[in-house]
A protein has these predicted regions:
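Glycine-rich anion/phosphate-binding loops
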Residues: 10-25, 54-61, 200-208
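Glycine-rich, proline-tolerant flexible connector loops at the mouths of alpha/beta enzymes
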Residues: 3-13, 34-56, 225-235
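Active-site-adjacent loop and "lid" segments of alpha/beta metabolic enzymes
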Residues: 48-57, 75, 100-105, 159-166, ...
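A short alpha/beta connector and helix-capping loop motif
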Residues: 16-20, 85-104, 109-117, 192-227
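Alpha-helix-loop-beta-strand connector modules within alpha/beta enzyme cores
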Residues: 22-30, 51-76, 115-121, 169-181, ...
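Catalytic beta/alpha-barrel core
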Residues: 54-55, 70-85, 96-110, 120-132, ...
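Catalytic alpha/beta core domains of metabolic enzymes, predominantly
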Residues: 118-225
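Short beta-strand segments at enzyme active-site cores
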Residues: 32-39, 74-79, 183-185, 219-228
Length: 260
């Protein structure tokens, strides 16, 4: 099993290091492959008042320091513009292992091709507006990629609501055998714009959806987590408390044993 986990946005060196170390130790104990995730800039905000993050340069410097402190740690971060990708490739090649394309940018051809021209794994979030079979069009743009992941993060279902279609997840598992299908259990419970000037969500449903994905055969999971989710600068309502991660991971491992 693979886990991609961390806070919504990078807040500080100490904050990210502590989360990454906690999750590294937990995953090593449970035999789970781990990638730490955090964003340097939350460019897609519900309103102008939304907190965006520490910024590209300072965050990437912190990523480098965290990787130096935690042996073999792998880090994923999302990009929004081609210059982000170019700067990672030139100046911060050692700080990032996976480049993520956000869901709302999943059809941006030049952005995808630029990410795939690096020697990085590319994780593409499947847009909330996209059918599972339409992912084939995205994958046609990734021929130069070292490795590609596709992440399911829910489908728009009316105003401020997302749902998960697990037949669609099964479709991607069956029809894209050369791609790792990832299930994002925390953004799947998001209510986009549901709190007026910010997005809402309900983290209580995260374990349920993650278990359902595991039962379908997913073995790659994306979850945002935070020591104090309700005090997080973004996506707090759908982030899992760090102390609850062990229980969720163990449940997924138990299901994986049963279906195999």
């Amino acid at each position: 099993m693979r886990l991609i986990a961390g806070p919504c946005q990078h807040e500080s060196l100490v904050h990210s290091h502590n989360i990454a170390k906690t999750l590294t130790d937990l995953c090593n104990e449970l035999g789970v492959e781990f990638y730490y995730k955090a964003s340097f800039d939350k460019a897609n905000r519900t309103s102008l008042s939304g907190k965006r993050g520490v910024g590209f340069h300072d965050t990437l410097l912190d990523f480098r320091a965290i990787k130096e402190s935690i042996p073999d740690l792998k880090i994923l971060t999302d990009v929004h513009e081609i210059w982000h990708i170019n700067n990672i490739a030139v100046d911060f090649d050692d700080a990032v292992d996976v480049i993520q394309i956000p869901a709302f940018l999943c059809r941006q051809t030049d952005l995808i091709k630029a990410a795939c021209d690096t020697n990085k794994i590319v994780n593409i979030k499947k847009g909330q507006f996209l059918a599972p079979w339409d992912v084939a069009g995205i994958l046609s743009k990734t021929e130069n990629a070292k490795e590609v992941w596709i992440t399911e993060r829910g489908t728009s279902f009316g105003y401020n609501t997302l749902v998960n279609d697990f037949t669609g997840v099964q479709y991607m598992l069956d029809n894209y055998p050369n791609v790792d299908v990832v299930f994002d259990a925390t953004h799947s419970v998001q209510k986009p714009g549901g709190n007026g000037t910010s997005s809402g969500g309900n983290r209580a449903y995260v374990p349920t959806l993650a278990r359902a994905a595991a039962a379908v055969g997913v073995s790659n999971f994306f979850m945002e987590t935070h020591p104090e989710p309700d005090g997080a600068p973004s996506d707090g309502p759908n982030m899992v408390a760090l102390d609850d991660m062990r229980s969720i991971i163990q449940q997924l491992l138990d299901i994986e044993k049963v279906i195999k």
